[in-house]
């Protein structure tokens, strides 16, 4: 009996030791799996951050270049609507050529894909018209001021309607810093000049249309599955009719195209950059939030003005230059707000109760 008891205890001890070894092995395996999962997530986040930075840089270079080339092209040709129309037509034509060449960049023409882009280009045309009216009744300083405040309203729209968390303190400071720095620049440059209620009305209409356009563009990239080249085609092709209307409405049809130095070269170059900015713009918009995309546009404008002042110091001012540099610096502090984590009760709804 003693021998059997000893053997039984030994067997139990062996079983406990084996169970402990198996438990330790399982714990180590789970820990390793968690570490591997964490490493994979960190690698994925790093790759995503690099992708975002790459397309922000590409889009910014195209945007800044486009501002300069457009000025040269319009200056040489004298017809801004013709320059814009040529850029739209070439961008749409490039996608069609790619499709006929077998690139497979265009999907089926369906109502559920076409109608949203009709709405988007309608907002674009209305925004362009209201911007022209705003510039007629206000000055450049007022328009730049409104544009610099735009990320704040876009940020609010994303929070209310697009399930984004509210930006952290650093990002709020960043957005406010851009506004204050731009205000200092404008106060020392042209100031803000608004001609009565009509000027304020058109400035507000343009501002709100642009804010909705920015957020709706992000909505398109998230909810309508298509290639970036399809987005390039739809936005450019559908913007041609409103541009033709503007061509006649502004009286450009009664003018002759000027034959300034390098007119054709600058026109062709603007069309090439137009294709690049169309693609990089949609690609950039698809990888970052609407607020970040709006802020990038503001910083591109401020950086271009800074470059112009430094290279062509006709109206150089230390205060203006430092204010511009500060606005860009504040903008670089911005970090994207993540999506809100759904709550157990009422998960997947915005603060206004709109389901996502």
Model-derived regions: residue spans:
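Polytopic endomembrane small-metabolite transporters, centered on the Drug/Metabolite Transporter
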Residues: 1-4, 9-356
């Amino acid at each position: 009996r003693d021998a059997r008891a000893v053997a039984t205890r030994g067997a139990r001890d062996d079983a406990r030791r084996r169970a402990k070894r198996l438990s330790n092995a399982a714990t180590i395996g789970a820990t390793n799996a968690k570490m591997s999962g964490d490493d994979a997530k960190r690698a994925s986040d790093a790759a995503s951050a690099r992708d975002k930075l790459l397309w922000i840089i590409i889009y910014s270079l195209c945007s800044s270049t486009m501002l300069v080339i457009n000025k040269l092209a319009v200056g040489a040709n004298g017809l801004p609507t013709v320059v814009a129309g040529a850029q739209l037509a070439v961008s749409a034509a490039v996608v069609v050529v790619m499709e006929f060449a077998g690139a497979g960049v265009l999907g089926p023409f369906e109502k559920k894909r076409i109608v949203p882009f009709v709405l988007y280009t309608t907002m674009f045309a209305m925004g362009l018209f209201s911007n022209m009216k705003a510039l007629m009744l206000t000055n450049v300083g007022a328009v730049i001021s409104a544009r610099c405040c735009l990320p704040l309203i876009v940020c609010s729209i994303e929070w209310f309607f697009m399930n984004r968390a509210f930006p952290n303190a650093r990002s709020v400071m960043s957005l406010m810093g851009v506004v204050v720095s731009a205000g200092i620049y404008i106060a020392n440059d042209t100031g803000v000049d608004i001609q009565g209620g009509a000027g304020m009305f058109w400035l507000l209409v343009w501002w709100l249309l642009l804010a909705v356009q920015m957020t709706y563009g992000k909505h398109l990239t998230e909810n309508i599955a298509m290639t970036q080249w399809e987005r390039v085609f739809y936005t450019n092709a559908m913007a041609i009719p409103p541009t033709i209307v503007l061509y006649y409405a502004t009286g450009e049809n009664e003018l002759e195209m000027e034959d300034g130095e390098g007119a054709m070269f600058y026109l062709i170059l603007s069309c090439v950059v137009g294709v690049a900015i169309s693609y990089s713009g949609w690609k950039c918009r698809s990888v970052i939030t609407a607020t970040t995309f709006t802020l990038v546009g503001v910083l591109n404008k401020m950086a271009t003005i800074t470059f112009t002042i430094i290279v062509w110091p006709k109206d150089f001012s230390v205060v203006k230059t430092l204010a511009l540099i500060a606005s860009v610096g504040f903008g670089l502090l911005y970090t994207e707000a993540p999506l809100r984590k759904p709550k157990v009760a009422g998960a997947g709804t915005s603060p206004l109760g709109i389901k996502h």
